[in-house]
Structure formats: C-alpha cells, structure tokens
Amino acid sequence: QEEMARAQHYQDSIQAVAQKQEQMQKAQEIAASLPVVPDSTSLFFQASQGSEEFTTLENDVLQLTFSNKGGRVCKAMLKEYNDQQQQPLVLFDGKDASLSLGFEGKNENILSNQMYFQTTNVTDSTVTMRLNAANGGHLDFIYKLLPNSYVVDFTVQASGLQNFFSPSVKTMSVDWKQRARQMEKG
C-alpha cells in the first residue's frame, strides 16, 4: 500500500512538472509572437526607426558592403579569387553573418543590431556609421579599409554620451554569428 502511494506521488510529480513546462512553453510562444514596441522615452528612440540602406567600400582586393541597420559589414567579397562558378568569391552576405555590439547604459542598454545608423564621412576607403542620440550625442562605428589589404580598421567612438554610460563600465558585448560557406569543391 505504501509503495503504491509512493509510486502515485512520483507519477503526480512528473505530471505536475510536465504541466508547468507546457505552460511555460506556451507563455514563451505568446510573448515571442507579440510585437516589440520601442520605448519612446529612450535616448535612441529615433534611431530605432528607419529603413535599411547600403554603402560599399573597396580596394584592389576586397569589396565590403555595409548596412546602416546595425552599422555593420553585411557582405564581404574577395576580388582576386573566384568561386566554383568563376564568380568573385563572396565570403559572407546578409544571410550568413550577423554582428551586434551591446552597450550597457545607466538606464537602458543598446544593441546595435536593433538600431539604424546614419552613414557619414564616406570616402572610397572609409565610412562612419553614426548612431544619433536625442541629447545631441552620438556613437560612431568608424571603418577604414586599408589599401591593397584584407585588413579593416574598426573604431568605436562615443561623443556627448558621458551621462548615458556609467563611469565604471569600460566594456561592450559582442554577439557575432557566422555561417561558414563551403568554398572548395568536394
């Protein structure tokens, strides 16, 4: 009798855990399906609205395409190499890679992949992606493509945001995802 009660209690516990997991799964699915409404009081609210635009930099060996959404490189093509179809070798494009830099502020956090940057200071070898803040400050992602090289200098520079960042925070998070393509036959 006692053993049957223990077995029943065990089964009841398993069933209760399964029900809780099912409820949590449903709640997560509902939350994921709800539209995200940007915080209109955010210092970067205006930058959270926009449309994607592209800018290209190139030298003799490399062509890079930048997106203002996230202020990132969204396509890289090697000009001196060809793929199996004898086309210029594309290392990655928008479907293959994502990069987001995270910045921890005093009252809010910024994820670069959720923001629309303003493209400024464009030359044949440089571009600045600027994230404008409502207070007149900005966060710049500065890219410089070196001549005849595969090297890209990347600088993050903040201006007028001293009240946004806590003085003790000296780091940023990097979320970089890359899907490597098969480039060789076989």
Regions found by a protein language model. Name each.
Residues 1-25, 133:
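Subset of Sec-pathway N-terminal targeting signals
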Residues 19-52:
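Short, Gly/Pro- and small/polar-rich lid/capping loops
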Residues 47-186:
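Soluble non-transmembrane domains of integral membrane proteins
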